[in-house]
Amino acid sequence: SALDQSQRMLNALEPGTQVPVHRHMETAETTICIEGYLEVVLYAEVSGQDETGGERKFVEVFRVTLCPREGKYGVQIPLGVWHSVDVKEPSTIFEAKDGAYVSASR
């Protein structure tokens, strides 16, 4: 509902899934792995644009394994932290964020 002030969703991910490096400036993100195996990768931005005015550049600073079989269930990604995922096997995750959904195109 548009009145709901939280975002909750299940997300099915396959190996090879491409999740662009991104961040959320209005909310932290909680990710819980229900099944499968993936790594959540945190980045630091090393340049706002490359020398041709192209894409931002990042360096990996931390990697968290999520795999329920190993007792590694979830991670809290702080507000504003650049992140992505590296899917190692078919996985299902639960994601939760604060606040109503706002399209990235806005």
Predicted regions and their residues:
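Short, surface-exposed charged micro-motifs
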Residues: 10, 30, 84
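Glycine- and acidic-residue-biased ligand/ion/polar-headgroup-sensing regions
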Residues: 26-48
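Short beta-strand His + acidic residue motifs that chelate non-heme Fe in jelly-roll/DSBH
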Residues: 20-22, 40-41, 75-77, 83-88, ...
